[in-house]
Amino acid sequence: MLDSFFFIYLQEDISNGMKYKMITILGPTASGKTSLAAVLAYHLDAEIISADSRQVYQGMDIGTGKDLADYTVASKHIPYHLIDICKAGSKYNVYQYQQDFLEVYNKIRETNKLPILCGGSGLYLEAILKGYHLSTVPPNEELRNQLNEMSHESLIQMLVEIQEQLNTKMHNSTDLDSKQRTIRAIEIGKHMLTEADPKTNFPEIPSLIIGVDIDREERRRKITTRLHQRLEEGMIEEVKQLLNQGIAPEDLIYYGLEYKFVTEHIIGKLSYDEMVRQLEIAIHQFAKRQMTWFRGMERRGIKINWINASLPMEEKIEMIQTLL
């Protein structure tokens, strides 16, 4: 049974100055991190800040797995932030995310509540937890034209080499899904090599970091099941609606994964079966890249406390309780 006295004490301690100013819950897709964050927020009277690079877009609901029902626990609405904050078709970035995060984080702290950062976008998470100093990167048309002449495989290798020079991974996992996104990631990386110091000037935020570790085969099973559920729930119709709103196919393809493959199906590039097969493979690869990123975060000095995803929710909450 959860210790209600502990949670009352902790809620008071938040306003009095505990050592952690935030809890971070991260994990790969289909690990159950959002539901864990919501239940924890329920017990702590906390608020959730999303760290998902695609859930920021309005109207991209099924494909990004917003699962807003997770934010209701025992009939109580859990406040969440940085979801549905910009229009589909636009191109949000990690620099904007840092600014939006700080605004929301400060507002939550002003109310003496605890922010819970939750998501699986490694770049966004690390930009907050490591406090990267970022600036806007202007388009470099000459560089883009040069890169467009190269194969996608060569571009990915170039991006890897840039990351090695920067000694970090300043790109999103989905930046490898399309040539356009990889080119933009290279453009940002080259700018950072000459213009920016990726270290810091972002406020240090002490955070307890929890990782949800799901068995590989269970993760694969859940990904496959969830993909078919989303198709049944109208994911193709969602993408058609976005296209009917005037969003260009290439702009949806830019977002990668579901929006890339479903759009290619709608415009006739892929059959339905090809779309499902290729999308399923891509999501499995994406989840693997997420875990690779999180392990890289640990190598770069970020301590992640891993919790087994198969544990009952009550046990997960109690384990987090012992770490606070």
Set out the residue ranges of the language-model regions.
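Phosphate/pyrophosphate-binding catalytic cores of soluble transferases and nucleic-acid-acting enzymes
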Residues: 2-324
